[in-house]
Amino acid sequence: MENEEKREYLAKSRSNSRNFLNDSIESKNIFGVDKKSEPNLKQSIDGGLNFSTTSSYNPSNLPRTSVFVSARNLSSTVGHGKNEKKILTDLNFFLKPGSMVLLLGSPGCGKTSLMNTLALLTSNEKITGNLLFNGKTGDPNTHHRHVSYVVQDDFHMAPLTVRDTFKFSADCQSGDKSEKERIEIVDNVLDFLDLKHVQNTVVGDEFLRGISGGQKKRVTIGVELVKESNLLLMDEPTNGLDSSISLEMLTKIKNKVQQEKMSCLISLLQPGLEITKLFDYLMIMNQGQMSYFGPMNQAIGYFEGLGFKFPKHHNPAEFFQEIVDEPELYCGIDDGSSDGGSGDSGSSSGGSNYNYNFKNKASSTMMMMNNNNKIIPPLKGSDEFAMAYRKSIIYKHILEYIDSHIPDEEERSKFIDYSTTLKPYSTGFGRQLSLNVKRGFKLFLGNKASIRLRLLKNVIIGFILGTLYWKLDTTQADGSNRSGLLFFSLLTFVFGGFGSISVFFDQRQVFYSERAWKYYNTITYFLSMIVTDLPMSIVEVLIFSNFVYWMTGLNKTWDRFIYFFLTCLVCDVMSLSIIRSVCSFTKTKYAASAISPAVVSPFILMCGYMKHSNEIPGWWIWLYWISPIHYGFEGLLLNEHSGLDYHCSPDELMPPSFLPTFNTSYPVGFEGNQVCPITKGEQILDSIGFHTEFYYRWVDLAIISAFTLLFWLITLVCMKFLVFRVYRKDPVGIKKSKPNKTTTLIKMNRNSTDSTTTNNSMNYFNNKHNKKQNDDSDSGEEMESVDVDVKSSGKANLRKDIPIGCYMQWKDLVYEVDVKKDGKNQRLRLLNGINGYVKPGMLVALMGPSGAGKSTLLDVLANRKTGGHTKGQILINGQERTKYFTRTSAYVEQMDILTPVSTVREVILFSAKNRLPNSVPIQEKEEFVDNILETLNLLKIQHSLIGDVESGLSLSQRKRVNMGIELASDPQLLFLDEPTSGLDSSAALKVMNLIKKIASSGRSVICTIHQPSTTIFKKFDHLLLLKRGGETVYFGPTGTNSKIVLNYFAERGLICDPFKNPADFILDVTEDIIEIIQPPQTLPTSTSNENNNNNNNNNNNNNNNNNNNNNNNNNNNNGNTSDTLNNNNKKNLESSLSSSSISFDPVESFKESKENQKLLSIVENSIMPVGTPVAVYHGKYSSTIKTQFIELLKRSWKGGIRRVDTIRTRVGRSFVLGLVIGTLFLRLDKEQNDVFNRISFLFFSLMFGGMAGLSIIPTVSTERGVFYREQASGMYRVWIYYLTFVLSDLPFVIITSYAYVIPVYFLTGLSLSNHGWDFFYHSFISVMLYLNFGLTSIAFATSLPVEEMAFLLNGVLLSVTSLFAGFMIPPPSMPAAWKWAFYLDFISYPLKAFLITEFKDMEFVCTDNKGAIPIPIPSQNTTKFFCPITHGTQVLDRIDYKISFQYWDILIMASFTFALLVGGYLSLKFIRYQNK
């Protein structure tokens, strides 16, 4: 936003506020309605608030584009019979063009379900009642054309820029507009959302750096606004935005709604007063039922009519949300003006001040109390509120209004045509395909790291193959090598397909969203995937083919090269189609990564190389015919061997000359005669069982293409009809846990001085020793106003020898990052000369607009920055920060990264056991955790699994669990980053009550917060306010009811409106351009000073009974006083608003202020009083190695066994494949062909182990985020974490291995000599192999930034290790330059061990000359058959395997295991991709 636009906007906002305040003061009601006069309810319903464009709604007068929504008895259920569950129950409401409806309710109340119902995006729900749009039911095929639905989740294509994201949405949803109009729409939305300056920045994700979280939320809004639809639905659109940006954005939306006559429903979590005033109607939901729907200006009066009391100057949105959840809070409220506490209550016309006092039974007929002196509210529970609303006059008028405004047939024609004549898609098929292809190429080109890696992979593998099979000859050995080379070429592309798993799942949620809104037909998106993949596939195959084909000396004709290229290309595309088809019908990437190898493995096995077609049993021959790889392999062999003549080198002639009977006369010997077994390439094809007709290669290519089309079709069908998740779940019907006595007391008895001792669970955070905290003598009364409550409690602090809080100060703090500008490396300063401090008992708020550096400063103070350059001084208890800092502090991150397979209690207890000193008994640690659970209201869900964001705990619960994990360390210094982000006002207040209590217990607390309500802001006693650029606008105490901070700005001519949230006001001050108002130097407050108010309040507390007895008189007097004060406020405010304005620099003003001078004098010296005890640490970690090892092992093991689906998939996959292999090679005999069969299936077992190892990558990626957080907190040693993770997975590795080995070993009839020892030896080698492959996957997953790269490199490694294992090309045939690769290949050693065990004592025969080579005897005019292999040692000698190395192989494999362990540990310890 430019300077002039900002000035104009601020002026306009100030003018609106001025007009609104004048009206409000005159009527003595913040919503502009005089409570003393009964308004015309029908007129309020018809006109709404601030909807002055039409005095009454007349459908025939509205433009054609308007949509009037009406709902009558709208209900929604899921399930059937006993499992039926109500989602929405008998909702009656309307959405009127030109008006905005605010939807409030706690998480799980049904807000998202209602939004989905209005958008016609329900799937399994049964909808009853009437839902009409302009009097007609919505057509699911065309309804989306008129609806813009902003969902909670920010699903975007990370590599796309902001402009490209908006442009794609506009192109797909506004096809009826010209290109120029669409560009203009995108430009307008970019300006509308203030995203113009980042329009060419990628959206990004956790691994691709892009725009900020708040900007990403605005992008989510923008992709719907470019649609320019008639019905606007927004589900919590302000999450992650600060209050000033939220207000600015919603004000613009309000203007847009009024100007364009849109119908609008918006759900919000913590709306401030200014935001609430923008809405015309209010809808409150609770457990799927409607507690209120009606005009905003009637809501307070409605609830007061039910017996509740709205506190004076309280935020209405908080009142509306809390009253249905915790009605006890608003029963029997003394709306006087006494001040009962520091910041929680008090009286001042300049802020939203209120005071909870309990009246006795005689003083109010509205309040009832039970025998335990607990307040009984007039209404409680969703059923009672819904029933009361249905009996209200408002409900009656709402129904009348809905029924009277359903248009007749004539009027319906003037509205949007909802008939099926409207096309579902705004663009044609060709246009959709063009847009998707264009975006696909942008996405592809945006992932440069993947492009480089894929190209490099093909260069490296192509070079390896070219040099390994350099200039193949036409000898017998090279004939076999040609077949092995061609088989491996296919494997290279098959394994490369695994890299697409993560990409598919990364983009699937975006596709689901766009498919639901009919951006395009599914087939166009599907075709665009194929089209955008094809160029890269062509380049990859071209590079690979040129290296392999010409370097190895394959059949050197251009037509055969072209066929080789085409076959490899089609096989590459086909393998990708197989993997994508698996991904399309699996729910998670965990399942896809486990199932994909199981699908691909039989196709590899049945291709004809490992098991010749003429040897496949009849019950599996169908698998041979449906294996697409078989046709690719057959085509390549036809292309290579057809017409090729082979010869024998002297040592390849049969029988060999060293045979004892070689020169013996017939019939004993061969009389010196020899033959060359294979002289024509067709002989090789015939021996395998392949076609020998040269033309058939094109048939094979056509069949591969047909299989590719089949897998494409499977993928398309699944993508079109399957949906695993589109929107966040909204679990209505789950009863919300009732606030415990402690929490209720904290909220209700805010002015009680002994509330600390009332709360047993909170007391646990108080110090056992009744010490009074010392204040710094130089701080002065204004600079130090912390009231530390450290009363003794019945429960001792865990660390009796350690102070409960600590002293932290920072001076001239500067933080810079390296950036590149104009091709030069420069440093960008994010923090500039920040000063401040925190003491025990202080709760400091870090505030500022987006980009001010709040989180950056918190990360610097908490020592969480992993990059950049920090300057300045940070002292902890007067000393430089040491490596033991993590033992003193705790950091609650904004992102709730938690272990999904652990329970709530387990994660908190885990933190306590690892972060509390080992000297604390286990029983005390568990009691400590119990009290944390009680304090955080988590007892009812303590044994619930955390789960993921979609199916696990709610956002509020996850926030509290995250806090509990850090509180379990019993920290002296607590950092919190946006602890209320994403919470509704009730949940946010609960969290802040806890944080305030923690600070009051004597701890030092620093907290960033971006959108605090008035009530929440008053919880903070100190404020550090930053502006964009990381400069200080204010540091100091806030004062009672924010008096000190507001007076600071008032002295500079900046007056906070009496009804404005002080937090919003001070954020406005941080704008680059601000206007100040002169000459007022103080706030327009009560004529009596605050000390008198405090004294009066104390007297009121001391004489509570007298006050209660005279309550009615006091209320009357308070009403007169309120009128007088409001008149004074109005005069002062009008005088100030009419004054002149000048420019103001908040940073320079603070630098020159006395507050800054006092701050500098404090931070110049140590703020810690002399003689204060300081904890002394002797180690970085609180717990011992033994404790860490046991706790980590327990957690990892529980996490493993709770991933039931993963275990079933891993074990089931191995067992099923074991049965397939076992029955395919059933009861192997000792014939000549069984020699190769034994070798091939043993080699395949190794390959399968490598593919099975891929399934652990998603798990490692998920756990890596948790590890980063815990490691930064200093919970445990890295090597213990890594070792226990591996050990906990070892049993599953063993089970998985045995699930494959047992059926294979006994079904195939492998050796059982030495009393079965060979079986156990084989099993042990298999377990070691599976373990090594798993360790390799872990190393890749921890050392690479994204899963795609981990899958891709795993495929490369599997290809290379398979190549050098000794099966594709025997060691004697390897060039000398590549022999080292054979010895470094960890697959070669288990293959060697398998073969030595199997062949060392085995004899082979040629029954009925089967497999024997006929040797002509010319002298006798006959033929004698030669059996090539009669003993297994011949096989071992031919491949140069020594029997004596059988057990050395185990040691070598163990050394590989150790090396992989070390490599994984080093990557986990030193490589970080979540940099701050």
Swiss-Prot record:
Q: Where does ATP 1 bind?
A: 105-112
Q: Which PROSITE patterns match?
A: ABC_TRANSPORTER_1, ABC_TRANSPORTER_2
Listed GO biological process terms: aggregation involved in sorocarp development; cell differentiation; endocytosis; endosomal lumen acidification; sorocarp morphogenesis
Protein name, UniProt field: ABC transporter G family member 18
The gene from which this protein is expressed is: abcG18
A Pfam family matched by this chain, by name? ABC2_membrane
Keywords, in A-Z order: ATP-binding, Endocytosis, Membrane, Nucleotide-binding, Repeat, Transmembrane, Transmembrane helix, Transport
Annotated stretches, region: Disordered? 743-786, 1081-1141
Phenotype upon knockout is:
Cells that have a abcG2-abcG18 disruption have an endocytosis rate roughly 70% that of wild-type (or rtoA disrupted cells). Disruption on abcG2-abcG18-rtoA cells have an endocytosis rate roughly 20% that of wild-type. The exocytosis rates of abcG2-abcG18 and abcG2-abcG18-rtoA disrupted cells are roughly that of wild-type; abcG2-abcG18 endosomes have an unusually high pH, whereas abcG2-abcG18-rtoA endosomes have an almost normal pH.
